[in-house]
């Protein structure tokens, strides 16, 4: 029994540690993968603001268009840039050499970002930039301290400052309690929240395009297993009726 308990603990402990994260407060993204309009807007925002530096190297344009209900004309007009073709993988415009020169690091591919982080993390991250004159691009991030990227949505969100909380220990450093808007951007806070939610929704879809289909098929699988259980139970009763 002890070995069974120990084995169960060893299996579940890594999952619990990953789920706990770093203890930061995350806002709920409240995404809906069934909201096709949100997914379409998120795809548009990602292509316009993110693909300069980030790729979705496991996703093709035509697969995205098929899943999100985007016809070829709209795909070519709104999502394809440069020499990109519908059958191409979604790559970034920037070369790795240029990325190293400008940022000191190659920006990560974002296909699986909501799976190895979480949708709530991505949503909160995009809302957590604040002014910091000590950083190369003048901004920092509450969730990702010393972030190396500029706030590409800053003109839309506006400028935020960090809200500091004094340390409760003598000689301790103040900590960041949150952020506050000090200069309005091109969008209202509500409009920016919706935009960030759409981007998060799209990235969640990109991380697992089959998720909705998997859930749909899963319901039939559970019904089949339930029916199979009933048959197995009736068969068991038939086999054992003479014994009892």
UniProtKB/Swiss-Prot annotation:
Pfam families: Cytochrom_C1. The keyword Iron applies. Keywords: Cell membrane, Electron transport, Heme, Iron, Membrane, Metal-binding, Respiratory chain, Signal, Transmembrane, Transmembrane helix, Transport. Residues 1-19 form the signal peptide. It is a single-pass membrane protein. It comes from the Bacteria. The main subunits of complex b-c1 are: cytochrome b, cytochrome c1 and the Rieske protein. This is Cytochrome c1. It comes from Allochromatium vinosum (strain ATCC 17899 / DSM 180 / NBRC 103801 / NCIMB 10441 / D).
